Amino acid sequence: MRQKAFILVALLISIGGGYVFTDWYATIPASAKAKYVGRDTCIKCHQAQADLFHGSHHDKAMDLATDETVLANFDNQTHSAFGVESRFFRDGQKYMVNTEGPDGKLHDYQVKYVFGVEPLQQYMVEFDRTDDMPENEIARLQVLSLCWDTENKKWFHLQPPDVKEKIEPTDPLHWTGRTQCWNTSCADCHSTNLQKNFDLEKLQYHTTYSEIDVSCEACHGPGSQHVELAESWSMFWDRKKGYALAKLKGEDTTAQIETCAKCHSRRGGIQEGFCGGQSFHDFYTNELLTEQTYHDDGQIKDEVYVYGSFLQSKMYHEGIRCTDCHDPHSTKVKFDTNQLCTSCHAHPAGKYDTPNHHRHKDGSTGTKCVECHMPETTYMAVDPRRDHSLRIPRPDLSVQHGTPNACTQCHIDSAKLPAAEQKLLTGKQYLDWLTLAKENKTIDAELKRLDAWAQENVVKWHGTEKQKPHYAEVFHRIRSDSSDTKAYDKLRQMIADKNVADIVRGTAAVEMGRHSEAIQLVINRAFLGAEKELMSPVLKQLQEEVNPMVIQGLLQTAELEITSIVNATWKYEAVDRTGRPNYDGVVVPLTHYVNTLVRLMDHKERVVRIEAARVFLRVPTTVQNRLLDSKQLARHEVVFDELIESVKSNAERGSALLALGSIYQLRVDVSLPERAMVDEARRKKSDKYFDLARQAYRDAIRVAPHESGARGNLAAMNDQLLERYSFEQRKLDVQNNKDDATKFAGLMLKRKKIEEETTKLRKDELKVLGDEARRAIASNVGAGVVDRYAMALYVDGQVDECEKQLATAIQLAPDDPMIVLHYTLILEKQKKFAQALQYADKLLELVPDDPSYKAMRNNLQRQLNQ
């Protein structure tokens, strides 16, 4: 009996064990994709989290315009800005605004959606909606520049900080323009599971989302598989997928931080469909610490949305993550007091949260940790945001390099200024002081006095122990003087130092490209050096670097080096009998670049692969074919397709289509007249990319008719097409062959059509460039735009106006070698040899070893002496 019982128990255990094992072993197929289920499904099990989420900034990120959601006063209110009086009113249940439209005239528009809840609320108008669009699709939404200040309860006009004049309807910055389009610029971060769905052919949006605001699945990922597992009878989560949501709480902080970075970063998209927990670098390219967006020491200047700052911080490198300070569901900080910091910095009593450390009276603003270590900058007129680089105040860097510091910022109200400057700065914040100080010597002197006062007190309190060498010095020096060799050497050291934050190292790599002497040295090595000396410091670092942001920076400078080598074939007279560049002499130096780029095309991060593929296109096709085997060329085609997909994911932007055309154009094999020299397969491939490039430029003109670039590029390609027609016409025997005569006549008709189009393209481009140049001059930025306008004027025969515009460009960017070169050449054209000689000398200061610049300078000297 006992034996039977034992056998029965054993059998039951075996069956039970088998069931348990089977239950554990079963898994969701790897190919199965989770779907979005919505917050109502999540609430069933996660009510506590839902309660915290309700009413949060994520919950209020976007909504329909209703009596419950609209905070502004639409009771027949008016607001005037730059000569335009707008009126806010109701039409039954609809919220309406009468304001300037894309044609420059006043129109009534319905406000359909609201954006945000505090400290401001914005409002959106829908354009281009057709009657046949499904209810769940949204057409083009434009964000009004008229906003509601929720604290002061008033309307205000939101103006870009660097634009002082009225924004015209043709400007992309106008509220009806591209930069204020919700579908392109806002939607991805204000809604869940956004599908942009832009129809390039019809120029229409069919945008959808699963939830209108930033809901649960925006961070945790689509939840259908999680729900399936939670509601199943299984005793286990999935052995491969766990609980089938993004793993945001693991020991590695990367997944959580990069999930937040998707929206809290200054970045560009390279593909759609990011889900929480995925790699940021497979979907986005993060902006480095550029001169336009960050101060030289890495403090925030423009709107950069946290991530780039946090990557610089010691907190990030010590494993701190977003939810250590912020509640992930309410989005609020966990404490409004210094406990937010001291809950981790639990040092002996009296070390930090005491006057012995902060040197301020108890209860004053200066006693708060965040005031010194996370100073605020106000954006969008009323929205103060804290710098997340969490740094020690460094007034010594302010004294040396003009960077901000928390001490001067807090004590700016103690400044002593004459009445004129006081009036100029009324209502301005610290960032405005720093900007105005560059133009106003009185303001600059007062800021320097305050910085020196702050530095004196910091040294008195804490000594100089914390004032260690900082990358601000290096960035400031190379940006002030591109020929500073010592700064260049320090940049090299910085890139190789793994103790330096990766975003700083990546920025250093980009800054190396400023150093004109280093670029010239690359050229000299390519044409004059021995093989063992051919590898540049950038290339050496690129061969061993693993961090995506550092690689991106290195690739930018590597592209400059490759392009400089290729372009220098003309300067060194490396041409063949047809007058085309002969690249045989640069095969060896380019070999190192090609091998490195091919390796990077297998990188795990998409952003690295496509950037390597893009830079690879700078290598001439003939050199590519010589250095790569068929397998490597095939691999490049795969990654090239990834690159094209990435660019096309932003096809609603004229700049993306302009880039697409340039990418296709780089794949055109040879100059078109020498078509007989190319085999049929290569000719067809070249023709395909030639046609694709022209179509991309045409699309760019359709999408962004008020933006420059595409017309000029298309006109240049038309010139190539005309060369092809001329070449084909020369081969025809018109006198003796009737068919040839017919072909000739057909080509003449084609020529006429292309010539007429090209003339119009250049005329329109000149007008658009003129508008852009005027905006750039008014904003005191954009010397490159003014330079391009000047070149277009020259092509149009307006030499005097070209000289005038180049003189302006020189004022905006006195150390830009290309602008200095153009100005020198136009002065020579105008026979102003003495002035031209001065700028030729300036050019040789910037690029000392360039043989063509030396020859130009000598020629100018001869003409002056005649």
What is each PLM-predicted segment?
Residues T22-A26, A48-G116, L120-R129, V143-S145, ...:
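Primarily the internal scaffold of c-type cytochrome electron-transfer domains
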Residues D484-I495, E517-L542, S564-L600, T622-I644, ...:
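Amphipathic alpha-helical scaffolding segments comprising HEAT/armadillo-like alpha-solenoid repeats
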Residues N499-A501, E531, E545-N547, K604-E605, ...:
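Short inter-helical turns and helix N-cap capping residues of alpha-solenoid HEAT/ARM repeat scaffolds
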Residues L560, R618, L666, Q720-E723, ...:
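Register position in tetratricopeptide repeats
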Residues A651, P705, S779-V781, P814, ...:
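Short coil turns that delineate tetratricopeptide repeat
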